[in-house]
Swiss-Prot record:
Species name: Listeria innocua serovar 6a (strain ATCC BAA-680 / CLIP 11262)
Pathway(s): Isoprenoid biosynthesis; isopentenyl diphosphate biosynthesis via DXP pathway; isopentenyl diphosphate from 1-deoxy-D-xylulose 5-phosphate: step 4/6
Classification via Pfam families: YgbB (PF02542)
Enzyme Commission numbers on file: 4.6.1.12
Binding positions for 4-CDP-2-C-methyl-D-erythritol 2-phosphate per the UniProt entry: 9-11, 35-36, 57-59, 62-66, 101-107, 133-136, 140, 143
Top-level taxon of origin: Bacteria
Signal peptide span: none
Name used for this protein in its record: 2-C-methyl-D-erythritol 2,4-cyclodiphosphate synthase
Residues involved in a divalent metal cation binding: D9, H11, H43
Cell wall biogenesis/degradation keyword on record: no
GO molecular function, one term: 2-C-methyl-D-erythritol 2,4-cyclodiphosphate synthase activity
Record family assignment: Belongs to the IspF family.
Length: 157
């Protein structure tokens, strides 16, 4: 059996936060604002995985009204969901994700992100693809107000 899920996340950029994307700390003057560490890439991936197994969404498992998840490490949240997915007998077929940001440039960090995500999903880096794009200065990402991410995942049982 195969299952496909897609996920999307967006967070506002803020001067008083660290920038963490794909589980990697990226040196930048701004970070992402959110209840957890606001890792848009890991949130999109987590939501895609949850969608693939038909289990609602990330907010159902980790509500932003629950102080237990205040400043939570998104890698730990993804790992928690992945344990449940593996317990149901699924493994990763492949994952494709896109980060949408005008700045900072993501290219220097993409390989580190791929390796970190593969580690969290007990997969090979070749099963994980991460890429980045801009919106050519259009919209909220183009105005550097926020960063978005999309993810598609294929699970196999």
């Amino acid at each position: 059996m195969i299952r496909i899920g897609q996920g999307y996340d967006v967070h506002k950029l803020d001067y008083d936060r660290e920038l963490i994307i794909g589980g990697i700390k990226i040196p930048y003057e701004k970070g992402l604002l959110g209840h957890s560490d606001a890792d848009v890439l890991l949130h999109a991936i987590t939501d895609a995985i949850i969608g693939a197994i038909g289990a609602l969404d990330i907010g159902h498992f980790f509500p932003d009204t629950d102080m237990a998840y205040k400043d939570a490490d998104s890698a730990e949240l993804l790992a928690e969901i992945w344990r449940q997915v593996e317990a149901e007998g699924f493994k990763l077929g492949n994952l494709d994700a896109t980060i949408i940001a005008e700045k900072p440039k993501m290219a220097p960090y993409v390989e580190l992100m791929k390796r970190r995500i593969a580690e969290l999903l007990h997969a090979e880096p070749s099963q994980v693809n991460v890429k980045a794009t801009t919106t050519e200065k259009l919209g909220f990402t183009g105005r550097e107000e926020g960063i978005a991410s999309l993810a598609v995942v294929l699970l196999e049982k």
